Amino acid sequence: MIDRKKSSNIQNILNKPYKYGFSTEIQSEEFPKGINEEIIRLMSHKKQEPDFILKFRLKAYQIWKKMQAPDWGHLHHNEINFNDVLCYASPKLEQGKNKAQTISEEILATFEKLGVPIKPNNKQPKIAVDAVFDSISFGTTLQKELKEQGIIFCSISEAIKAYPNLIKKYLGSIVPAGDNYFAALNSAVFTDGSFCYIPKNIRCPVDLSTYFRINNKEAGQFERTLIIADENSFVNYLEGCTAPQFDTNQLHAAVVELICFKNATINYSTVQNWYAGNNKGEGGVYNFVTKRGLCQGENSKISWTQLETGSAITWKYPSCLLKGKRSTGEFFSVTLTNNAQEADTGTKMLHFGRQSKSLVISKGISGGVSKNTYRGLVKISGSAIYSDNRSQCDSLLIGKGSESNTYPNLHVHNSLSKVEHEAFVSRIGEEQIFYFQQRGINIEEALNMIVSGFCQDVCNKLPMEFALEANKLLNIKLEGSIG
């Protein structure tokens, strides 16, 4: 007979204290709350930006004021009061010293506790890291080594001053300010983020990584990332993020733009672990992100891989514009929701080039009373003959109160292309757990094994450093007390 007491704990097995929920006590420089033209001008002046960036911001702000927040997602959350949002908050810099000179021991200790290597360490894998704390970057590692090969990797704020021509040419070219409500907001008030340029015929010798940490309780984080891979180049980019544990909501609205030229490859991997709120649905980060890549040249390739385990609300659709002949777009995703979390995420694969290909593999895991939605668009234009798409969207339900939805949208405008879509939903039930228990495997181990197998197709696509972290993170999320 099945142990009802133990099996009833399946729904709660995801509940594990959030290990990154600590906050760092530091002195902070803050702008007044709210989003308005005065704040935008103050921010641009503070960052000593050229006029074209201020114009870009102000234009975006005017667009944003006329827009309405999207309500088509399968999401339910309190209305965001932008008058209560801090657009800019940064640790106070000591007078006469730059950011690198004034990284306090507290901030260094924070990143070390998070496992982010911003100090040289021969024991750790060699990864170039840009560490962003609230509204500013505290420097990028391995810059000198990368510059020797012509690779630019720095904060977006530094790039605006040092490489204005590249910024002017590419900023907003893939995600224009008016693309959507949150992209317009980001374009108006973006603070920091990363910039990367890989020159022709260069394979980046190390993985590039940016780590985002929200520390201030009232601050929003509005980072901007821009990556350009010139002809015959290759780069792996890794992104991670965490936030303290508060009983109020924080806002994260980011934009990522990728440009990939002939025979170039960009692999963009994310482990998203913002605070998700407590088991009553209190607190957590509102995560509204726009990510898009352009495969401009022949044989160009962009691959998005993501593990989404955090945030109270997630609204995110990494996408590919496949313009080049024989270009390739890929999307590999695991989204794990628990308690009252809600995620509406997916991808767009837009085919314009002949013989272009796209692959979508999405895995959704839902526990508690969470809602997990996949929303996808595949569009093959009339000019994209002999193109091919395959999509696989699978869902795994844990317990009886969770919800899973899949909304595929397929448009094929020529008769010489092929689209495949398949999906299935399954539930971890008492019988499966009982089967494992009969072989001496406890509930937590059983759940870990089931979920690990379910996610294997995606986790195998992550770089080794992230794959290890991803498996560890899934196991942490799946741990809980067994009655």
From Swiss-Prot:
GO biological process, one term: iron-sulfur cluster assembly
The UniProt record lists the keyword Plastid: yes
Compartments where located: Plastid, Chloroplast
InterPro entries assigned: Fe-S_cluster_assembly_SufBD (IPR055346), SUF_FeS_clus_asmbl_SufB (IPR010231), SUF_FeS_clus_asmbl_SufBD_core (IPR000825), SUF_FeS_clus_asmbl_SufBD_sf (IPR037284), SufBD_N (IPR045595)
CC per GO annotation: chloroplast
Source domain of life: Eukaryota
A Pfam family this chain is assigned to: SUFBD_core
Key words, A-Z: Chloroplast, Plastid
Family of this protein: Belongs to the iron-sulfur cluster assembly SufBD family.
Protein name: Iron-sulfur cluster assembly SufBD family protein ycf24
Originating organism: Cyanidium caldarium (Red alga)
Designated gene of the protein: ycf24
